[in-house]
Each structure stands twice: as structure tokens, then as C-alpha cells.
Amino acid sequence: MVNFEYNGIKISIFNENLKYQKNTPVQNRLSLGTYEKEEIVGVRNAISESDVVLDLGSSLGVTSCVIASLISDSSNLVAVEANPTLIENIKHNRDINNFLFDIKNAPVSYNNRIVNFNYNGLSLSGSIIRKKHLEGNDTAWGKYTSVNMETVTPLDLERQYNKKFTFLSCDIEGEEYDLLYYMFDYFKNFNAMVVEFHELYNDSKYNRKDIHQKYLPHFHITNIGQTSIFKKR
């Protein structure tokens, strides 16, 4: 296990989640201050202390813990991660910071269905969308695995945790397009959203520009790289 202080919070990464790396290793990104930098800058810019937050794609729980530190009650956050190998690491990072947010192990989508959730040893790569470029290199990135999982919707999560979400943080490796398109009537009422768009993995018929155009009547939208910040008009 390696330990860091990042954006004012404590972060630990289990050894098994350090074994496989792609491009700049996760621990180096934490040391350099670049880990999920765009998303965290967006969150800091858009969130309010009173927000009730839905964090989709928690990974190791870094952004989740940053969010928990910025809201007045850390229990007003639900962190969702579909990769089953990361859940204990998220719980550990939550607990060492004495946060109280809930953690849900499930893929999120706009409807309920059985999907193949795909992941390997990389903590940032799991997705409903199959990433063929990550297959066939088990030595470098770990075995590429597909497991049948049932999706949950944001409305399912509101009912399960008895919350009314007002803020979205979203990094779900391509599923964001369909989620935002088909759940427009739900998300248009949020106070703010911070969404990382994954152009290379977009199997949807919608693109980032389409999503922006759909939401522009309701939000001011700014971009930081691949991350879009939606703030209620």
C-alpha cells in the first residue's frame, strides 16, 4: 500500500491496484497533482456545500473523497463504481478520512438491463463499453474480464438511499452520452454537473456537441479539456 495526501485528503492505494499501469502511473499522477485534475477543478468550481451528490465512476475514491470534503455533510454523497476489485479501496479511503458517504457497486445507465461490464487491472478503464484496444495485453494491463452485471439508474439510487441528488460528478468511460441524452428531463433540474467525455470510446449515436446543445437552455457550460462543467442558469 502507498499513501498520499491529495487535495487536502488522505489517499491510500492497495498494492493490487498498483500492479498494472498505463501511461503515467497513478501514484505519479497523485505526486504531481494531475490525478483527475480536470474533474476535481470542475467540482471545486461548481459544487455548493449544500449539494447532494451522485458520483459515478468512483474508481479508487479520490474524487469521491474530495467531494466529501467540500460538502457540509459527507453522507450527502453516493459514490458508484462498477469494478468489483476497487470497492474495498474506496471504502478504505472513505474510512481513513472519517467520511460517511455510501458506496454502490454497480454499473449505471439510463435503464435497467443486464450488461457485460469490462475491466482489467487498470483502475481507470472499466466500462460497459468494450475497449478492444485494451484486450490482449494481460502482462501489461491485467486480464481483460467481462462480467454480467445489472445496471442501476440514478432514480434507483435516489430510492435506495433516500436522497434527492442536486449535483453530478460523472466519469463512466463512454456511457455518459446515453445517460445524459435519455435522462435529460432528470438531469436538467440539477444545480450543476461535471462530466468527463470519452470521445474515443463513444459507441453512442450522440456526441459531446449534441449533449451540450441539448442542455444549453438550462446550463452555462464550460470545458476543461475532456471535462465539461454544467452550471444552472
Explain the meaning of each model-derived region:
Residues 108-112, 227-230:
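A short acidic, often aromatic-flanked loop/helix-cap motif at beta-alpha or helix-coil junctions
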Residues 9, 13-39, 109-152, 156:
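Glycine-rich adenosyl-binding loop in Rossmann-like folds that engage adenosine-containing cofactors
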